[in-house]
Amino acid sequence: MINRKKKLSLMVALLSLACTGLEAQNVWKGTWATAVEKTGKEDMPKESLSNRSCRQIVHVSFGGNEMRLKLSNEFGKHPVEICSVYVADTDKDKNSSINAKTVKYLKFGGKKNVVLEPGKALYSDVLKYALKSGQRLSITIDYGEKTPKNATSHRGSRTTSYIVAQVNGKPVSPADAAFGQQENVDHWYNLSAIDVKTDAKTPVVAVLGNSITDGRGTTTNMHNRWTDFLADALNAEKPYGVLNLGIGGNCVVEGGISEPAMKRFDRDILGQTGVDKLVIFEGTNDIGCCGGNYEHVADTLVACYKVLIAKAKAKGIKVYGATITPTKGNGWYSYWHEAMRQQVNEWIRKSGSFDEIIDFDELVRDPQDPQRLKAEYSDDWLHLNPKGYEVMGKFAAEKLK
């Protein structure tokens, strides 16, 4: 009797361990995300998205066998009708084409069609899909008749989206050659995030930034933002989520383009799935747009950093501070602006507020003229070029491993 009880207890213990292991392999983590924005007429296709299909390409960080897609109408004032959404492997030779054998349609509450309500975002149902690390994934949205004039979007996709008209009231087939032949734009529409089922220990880093993070100066469709290089370097060793939440022209405190970081932080950073690390690399525009009262603006920027750091740490997120890179040679540079940058960078390095520092300033500045970027890393003395972004991404990877 005693032996039977011992055996039963052992079986229960083993079953419990097995279930725990299964749960650890079965949690959602973010593999891709973008910061959604309110768009203007200049950011939309020449014609509306109504009764058209839009194929959009994203570069995921790590893979898995189950995924879900988050769509957003958070800045829309009207519903968005969607007939269907499907994903597929992007053709390796032609960005607008897909491998038709890999097409899989997403469902929303068990249905292909869905309506995105104004001010809302929603996830698709779970989709079994063999997603690979570093993959270029095509996401095609077949829009219905009713779409707003200004879609919730991300302006700086740095990839081309391919838009085609429906035929006889029906979306064209996934393999239709019309993709790439009608209208092409370099924006994303209604896309927000992709999550993958993975091990609970898979790390995820979110990056809060401006145009340097958003990829100004990169090569369209080549996926050479510094966060792309970061994702590739990290995933060469193990699965690692890298989420780029940069917005071109964005500020931390106020002003700039789109909602400032202080306003968008809860949605764009804390709202992502499974984030356990955060890089704050923003402040260039707060400094560059400053027209006076420089010391006060720098102090305010630091005070806002403290708020963001506290919010992240309250959620158990490790926070990395990235120093602001040089601007000499660009129109934003002046003695006073440089003094602000030095003041803020000094605080980032020495305050002890961040868990760790990623010193991009020291990395990419010209040793002979430290207020200026190295010539080989920049084409406009403000943003980096692909060579500079590669150096940044690989450097950051060593800090984040």
What residue ranges belong to the model's regions?
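Catalytic His-Asp segment of secreted/periplasmic serine-dependent ester chemistry enzymes
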Residues: M262, G288, T325-K401
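N-terminal secretory targeting modules
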Residues: I2-N3, A13, A24-L208, T218-T220, ...
